[in-house]
Amino acid sequence: MNSVSAAERLKSFGDAGPVCNKSIIFPSRVVTLANSFEKKDRSWYVKSQIPTDLSIQVNDITFKAHKFPLISKCGYISSIELKPSTSENGYHLKLENFPGGADTFETILKFCYNLPLDLNPLNVAPLRCASEYLYMTEEFEAGNLISKTEAFITFVVLASWRDTLTVLRSCTNLSPWAENLQIVRRCCDLLAWKACNDNNIPEDVVDRNERCLYNDIATLDIDHFMRVITTMKARRAKPQITGKIIMKYADNFLPVINDDLEGIKGYGLGKNELQFSVNRGRMEESNSLGCQEHKETIESLVSVLPPQSGAVSCHFLLRMLKTSIVYSASPALISDLEKRVGMALEDANVCDLLIPNFKNEEQQERVRIFEFFLMHEQQQVLGKPSISKLLDNYLAEIAKDPYLPITKFQVLAEMLPENAWKCHDGLYRAIDMFLKTHPSLSDHDRRRLCKTMNCEKLSLDACLHAAQNDRLPLRTIVQINTQVLFSEQVKMRMMMQDKLPEKEEENSGGREDKRMSRDNEIIKTLKEELENVKKKMSELQSDYNELQQEYERLSSKQKSSHNWGLRWQKVKKSFQTKREDEETRERTRRRSSTGQRTSFRRRMSMS
């Protein structure tokens, strides 16, 4: 049945239509013919002494009733020409696409027979739509079903947000009737108004009621939920409230991303696995409809996210980004989420940044996220050390991936500007982990990777560890040793400067020559220390040069030994060839001599 009202259908008959029975006057006893109903198989029968004369089919259920009680209250039935039944006496009527189905029509049938009517939030919306379908207006009887259901919705349902939620849920299968009758709009407006006005309630009351209201709103179907959120935004609800409801809805209806991932390989990462594998083909074949529903839900939720920062957590944004990638959301939506994450990156953690890796460009999302952060916080990045710490921890995690190319690791390591790091200990730890996981890197790649690290920003403990780290290139080790010596020198100088004022105060009454001699001794000591540092530097440089020459000598020796081996094989082969030729000649000579002796013996025997 389309959404055309029963009144319009009545007018469409015109003068050429069937004769209406609205002028018939029914005795009061006619409408009290039925005391109850009974069901046999898939049919409902009215218990009455008068035989039924009307068969009404709703879906696959047939109702046996009397024509007059229905005509007296239903304008639609009174306006159409009833067709005689072919199987039995009376008339037959089939109601197509009846709102609420057979259960709702059973309630209406009881109402037409003046049996008690039980209106409640569960059945009032279907009854309101069905009464509109049958055109049960005041024109046919005062207090008809349209007015009763409308009054119940207005004065009972809309007075309670719990009843309003119940009615709104019952409207899911009543489209387009519930929309045209403004039932959905009124319910959504009431819920949005209630959610917005909870801000003015004291906090102790909000804690009890707010959670229930928000949780119940987050259980609606996606269409009605979007209507409520859109109305809340139009009423200028607080972004934190809107974001809280959206996050709750995602928890209820979107799957946890790990449930859709298979073949996880952690490579010793414990709980923070990096290597995700999504069996997309199997997922789409087994539940293609469910995947499409999840994709539409994601796109709907992202479209109504409040633009204000802090409305939703960075953890939630990264979760939505992961889910969007898994369910192949639109590139524009993924880009929007990346921008949102970039603006809230300071609140993220390493586990949130571990995005499913099933594409060829698995690191591009992380790179763009950091780029968006730098664009948004370009002036404030110095005051946010949490970002450099986050990147250090993230690099340490992805460095454990044996399939991660060095170029992608280096791009991420160079994302933040140099002044964003106060200390490079975390970066050193990540580089060391990468070198440990990728032992086959060439010396050139090792030097290139270590250039991203500033040795001057390493702590003393990190320098001492790096000085004994054989995974680092030799040049980096020399630089770190130099840095260690320089740091020790600076520390000693600072200690001397701290002690100098104390000594001056103690000996303030001493002679001027003693002060000068003490200063000269300090200067002499510092010069000796500086000479020692220079000497150690020259020793390290000479050691480095010797090692470099030894390496080159060994490399050239290996090449020369390899060439000598080839030449020796050639000489050996030539000697072997000559020897084989000599042996061949010797056999030929022996055979020829043997043949001559045989022929001589034959000649002697013949003679």
Curated annotation (Swiss-Prot):
A Pfam family that this protein carries is: NPH3
Result of knocking out the encoding gene: Defects in shoot and primary root growth and aberrant parallel venation pattern in juvenile leaves.
NPH3 domain location is 211-487
Listed under GO biological process in this entry are: cotyledon vascular tissue pattern formation; leaf vascular tissue pattern formation; phloem or xylem histogenesis; primary root development; protein ubiquitination; shoot system development
What keywords does the record list, in alphabetical order? Coiled coil, Phosphoprotein, Ubl conjugation pathway
Residue list for modification Phosphotyrosine: Y428
Does the entry feature the keyword Translocase, yes or no? no
Q: Please quote what the entry notes about the protein's domains.
A: The BTB/POZ domain mediates the interaction with some component of ubiquitin ligase complexes.
Q: What is this protein called?
A: BTB/POZ domain-containing protein DOT3
Q: Which organism is it from?
A: Arabidopsis thaliana
